[in-house]
Amino acid sequence: MGIARILSAVLFLSVLFVVTFPTLLSADHHDGRIDTCRLPSDRGRCKASFERWYFNGTTCTKFVYGGYGGNDNRFPTEKACMKRCVKA
């Protein structure tokens, strides 16, 4: 009875993996990584004032980052934002 349960669990996990794996490769991923350029701008949770750049869907735009939190759609320079997010 123990072997049957183990085999059932392995089969279940295998089917689960096969069913969910294509979702991991969906439109929110680019070149195998999450496409940060599609994330909204996020100032973060603190009150510092750091000049950063985010991609707004069309171009890179300056915003004030609070210094902590936020998301990965945040770049130190316009050039870094353009390099990552603007498709040539």
Swiss-Prot record:
Function: Serine protease inhibitor that inhibits trypsin at a molar ratio of 1:1.
Example GO BP: envenomation resulting in negative regulation of voltage-gated potassium channel activity in another organism
Domain of life of the native organism: Eukaryota
Site (Reactive bond for trypsin): K47, A48
Signal peptide span: 1-27
Lineage summary: Eukaryota, Metazoa, Ecdysozoa, Arthropoda, Chelicerata
Similarity-based family: Belongs to the venom Kunitz-type family. 01 (intermediate) subfamily.
Gene Ontology CC: one annotated term: extracellular region
Pfam families, sorted: Kunitz_BPTI
Propeptide regions on this chain: 28-33
Subcellular locations according to the entry: Secreted
CDD domains: Kunitz_huwentoxin
Domain BPTI/Kunitz inhibitor intervals: 37-85
Protein name, entry field: Kunitz-type U15-theraphotoxin-Hhn1p
Keywords: Disulfide bond, Protease inhibitor, Secreted, Serine protease inhibitor, Signal
Tissue expression pattern: Expressed by the venom gland.
